[in-house]
From Swiss-Prot:
Subunit description: Interacts with ERCC1. The catalytically active form interacts with SPDL1.
Gene that produces this protein: Usp45
Binding of Zn(2+) 1, residues: C38, H40, C127, C130
Pfam short name (any one): UCH
Phenotype of gene-disrupted mutants: Mutant mice generated by CRISPR-Cas9-mediated gene editing show severely reduced scotopic and photopic responses and have significantly fewer green cone photoreceptors compared to wild-type animals.
Molecular function via GO: cysteine-type deubiquitinase activity; zinc ion binding
Designated name of the protein: Ubiquitin carboxyl-terminal hydrolase 45
Active site: C200 (nucleophile), H745 (proton acceptor)
Biased composition (Polar residues): 472-488
Keyword annotations of the record: Cytoplasm, Hydrolase, Metal-binding, Nucleus, Phosphoprotein, Protease, Thiol protease, Ubl conjugation pathway, Zinc, Zinc-finger
Organism: Mus musculus (Mouse)
Role summary: Catalyzes the deubiquitination of SPDL1. Plays a role in the repair of UV-induced DNA damage via deubiquitination of ERCC1, promoting its recruitment to DNA damage sites. May be involved in the maintenance of photoreceptor function. May play a role in normal retinal development. Plays a role in cell migration.
Region span, Interaction with ERCC1: 1-62
Length: 813
């Protein structure tokens, strides 16, 4: 039995039951009074329309703000205060927001009243006509019924469920295009990419590759195991086309394709690039450790590694078609066929078809007027930025011998004629010797290229810096299987570029070789040389030293069946190198070495030269400087073998030792022009260079156009282009570097647009679906700024004001 605690009183039930009911609060009483007097509820509320609209739209998202496609951290940047129209169910931001879409909807409703709205966060009902709050008690149970439905719907809706956002945007955009007669043309979306730790350099490049629509299209064609691949031989029409079955793509290629595919899916938010980045780190270990890296180096390693995988894939399929021949089983006829098909097949990999161009270096001896050209492939063009500073005057006395030639040939282009010695880095001039007479200007290093197989003939010995060139690939013997002749170019480059920014000018002022060499091909980290009887130049030797890192791999490859040596032509760009001896009777393939007899045609461009203005700093002015004519004199003189041979003939009585040492160095002119344009043009603005013992960044703004005409910088012999024809490119991607050398951040500006049908037809060689119409002139679209997971639509002017580091242009046909 419990005893009552005298300190506690039992509740008095009677008194509690008799207590009068009080209103919840004063506000609710006011709401009732106001609601009872509102005359708009009866015809400004529709339960059926609201239920239908809520079921078809995203919850608590302003539909108008959604059309602007503003995102942050992969989620839409939308106002928290969203109001729903109780007449039609439209959701818009409140009157306290910046856009006030809900209020605008009410004002633009016309004759039909849309004045009653409800806040989806506070459940406050408001009448724009009365400018007062309403209560759910007015007009019987209509408002109470709607509020109850909306609250239940909000409870069922998961917070942060924005998976349908981009999908709805694309459906609306596609519906609008169908009305305009553009059915089937969809605008890809833009998603943020998670930063794994100092991987903004990677994210910015991937964002631009994701907007390179032709890349995904070509990868999609050959993504599966067993894909049919047809190889036709234009050089050997007597051989029938070969149809091979490709194996599965390599791990990096597969990871890249899957990631680009995920970037196009509408159901996902920010993506994690962990799988793709890990695959790249396996090919290029230098990117491990989540350290700050360079975007351009990342781009080259990525494309090079993917190209290596595709090359091996194509070569393996060709060997499989011939039952995997070996040294013992393959006869001469089989070897010739494998080499012929391999040479043409490797050129069909999608990296070469999209990104690779060709640059021609033309050098003319001023004494004998002999002209020679050398063609180098490139993946991008690195352009130095001219800083606003007063230059030291050049001693004109050293130029007296070339002044008349400069004035006659370049009268309309005076500013482009440069003296090679004047542009030589200070460090190079300091360490140069009298034997450096054949040293080229360091501007030769401004182009980043992939060498063709016939050019990969340099072996550098660190002790004596001798260069040895190999015979043409056609003279090489066949020893083992084709797929064993390849090495991983990406891993080799990782060791070459692990300590220095390969694309900054910091790597340029290196000590020049003291021994003359034959010829150095263009390139920064993938240096190769070929013997060139008319252009023995020495300044490129420091770059050639970089090839020593892969010498052991090359020696092993040569010991096997060397079929890769002949699977390349002028547009073939293997990264492997073959350390072979130089025969005295070395023959050169047609196209690699050409004698020209007309100086006027040698330096002719497709159109008139670009005219720069005072203090101009633009992409055009940088290209103008890059392709301007140089005078090779002083320590940069040309060792002309024609002049040397003529002098030897005049002194037949001299000894053989004197003949060997009696080289003739002459003044020469040199110019670089583009001889084959790529489908996708990548320009690299060299913002990082060496200042003393440290690196510094050039922060000067460089103007870049939306539409670039490349014709003034192309040779008159440019492939598939007639003289006078324009070579137009449209800007679609920017990689921006903000900050300094010690701490910076990479972001991307990409143009979301309709894929170019004409460019696709040109590269793939087939017609697209009939009835598709492509807009005349520039394709429409909008610019998006992407900083890791932050995505925001920006005006075109903001994109053009970016501090560009990489520029992506696509060909306009």
């Amino acid at each position: 039995m419990r005893v009552k605690d005298p300190s506690k009183d039992l509740p008095e039930k009677g008194k509690r039951n008799k207590r009068p009911l009080l209103p919840h609060d004063e506000d609710s009483s006011d709401d009732i009074a106001v609601g009872l007097t509102c005359q708009h509820v009866s015809y400004a509320v529709s339960v059926n329309h609201v239920k239908k609209a809520v079921a078809e739209s995203l919850w608590s998202v302003c539909s108008e703000c959604l059309k602007e496609r503003r995102f942050c951290d992969g989620q839409p940047v939308l106002p928290a205060d969203v109001w729903l129209c109780l007449k039609c169910g439209l959701q818009g931001c409140g009157k306290n927001s910046e856009s006030q879409h809900s209020l605008r909807h009410f004002k633009s409703s016309g004759t039909e009243s849309h004045c009653v709205v409800i806040s989806l966060s506070t459940w406050v009902i408001w009448c724009y006509e009365c400018n007062e709050k309403l209560s759910t008690h007015c007009n019987k149970k209509v408002l109470a019924q709607i509020v109850d439905f909306l609250q239940k719907h909000a409870f069922k809706t998961q917070t942060g469920a924005f998976s349908r956002i981009i999908k709805l945007c694309e459906e609306k955009r596609e519906a609008g295009e169908i009305k305009k007669g553009k059915k089937g043309c969809t605008v890809p979306s833009v998603k943020g990419i998670t930063n794994l730790g100092n991987t903004c350099f990677f994210n910015a490049v991937i964002q631009n590759l994701a907007q390179t629509y032709i890349l995904f299209e070509l990868m999609n064609e050959i993504k599966e195991d067993g894909t049919k691949f047809k190889i036709s031989l234009s050089s050997a029409p007597q051989l029938e086309p070969l149809v091979v079955e490709l194996s599965s793509p390599g791990p990096l290629t597969s990871a890249l394709f899957l990631f680009l595919h995920s970037m196009k899916e509408a159901e996902k938010g920010p993506l994690s690039p962990k799988v793709l980045f890990n695959q790249l780190c396996q090919k290029a270990p230098r990117f491990k450790g989540f350290q700050q890296q360079d975007s351009q180096e990342l781009l080259h390693h990525l494309l090079d590694a993917v190209r290596t995988e595709e090359t091996k894939r194509i070569q393996a399929s060709i060997l499989k078609a011939f039952n995997n021949p070996t040294t013992k089983t393959a006869d001469d006829e089989t070897r010739k066929k494998v080499k012929a098909y391999g040479k043409e097949g490797v050129k069909m990999n999608f990296i070469d078809r999209i990104f690779i161009g060709e640059l021609t270096s033309t050098v003319m001896c001023e004494e004998c007027a002999n002209i020679s050209t050398m063609k180098d492939p490139f993946i991008d063009i690195s352009l130095p930025i001219i800083e606003e500073r007063v230059s030291k005057p050049v001693l004109l006395g050293k130029m007296s011998k070339c002044r008349s030639l400069q004035e006659t040939d370049q009268d309309h282009n005076k500013g482009t004629v440069t003296v090679g010695n004047a542009h030589q880095p200070r460090a190079s001039r300091k360490h140069s010797s009298p034997n450096d007479k054949n040293q080229l200007s360091h501007d030769r290093k401004h182009l980043r290229k992939w060498p063709s197989e016939e050019e990969k003939t340099v072996v550098t010995h660190p002790k004596n810096d001798n260069l040895e060139a190999s015979p043409p690939a056609s003279t090489l013997s066949t020893e083992a299987s084709l797929n064993e002749s390849l090495t991983d170019g990406s891993e080799r480059d990782a060791s070459l570029e692990s300590s220095v920014d390969a694309d900054s000018e910091a790597s340029e002022p290196e000590i020049a070789s003291k021994q003359p060499v034959l010829l150095r091909s263009r390139g920064d980290s993938c240096g190769h040389a070929e013997q060139h009887p008319h252009l023995p130049l020495a300044s490129e030797l420091p770059q050639a030293k970089e090839t020593h890192g892969g010498e052991e791999e090359m020696a092993e490859a040569i010991a096997e069946l060397h079929l890769s040596g002949t699977v390349t032509g002028n547009r073939d760009f293997h990264r492997e190198k073959q350390p072979l001896n130089v025969p005295n009777n070395l023959c050169f393939s047609e196209g690699k070495h050409t004698r020209l007899h007309s100086a006027q045609n040698a330096f002719q461009t497709l159109s008139q030269s670009y005219v720069t203005t005072s203090k101009e700093c633009s992409v055009q002015s940088c290209l103008y400087q890059f392709t301007s004519m140089e005078l090779l004199m002083g320590n940069n003189k040309l060792l002309c073998e024609d002049c040397t041979e003529k002098r030897r003939k005049c002194h037949k009585e001299t000894s053989s030792a004197e003949k060997k040492a009696g080289g003739v160095y002459t003044n020469a002119r040199k110019q670089l022009l583009i001889s084959a344009v790529p489908a996708i043009l990548i320009l690299h603005l060299k913002r990082f260079h060496q200042a003393g013992l440290s690196l510094r960044k050039v922060n000067r703004h460089v103007d870049f156009p939306l539409t670039l005409d490349l014709a003034p910088f192309c040779a008159a012999t440019c492939k598939n282009i007639s003289v006078g024809e324009k070579v137009l490119y449209g800007l679609y991607g920017i990689v921006e570097h903000s900050g300094s050398m010690r701490g910076g951040h990479y972001t991307a500006y990409v143009k979301v647009r309709v894929p170019s049908r004409k460019l696709s037809e040109c590269i793939t060689g087939r017609k697209t679906a009939a009835g598709l119409k492509e807009p005349d002139g520039e394709l429409g679209g909008h610019w998006v700024h992407v900083s890791d997971t932050y995505v925001q639509v920006v005006p075109e002017s903001r994109a053009l004001s970016a501090q560009a580091y990489l520029l992506f242009y696509e060909r306009i046909l």
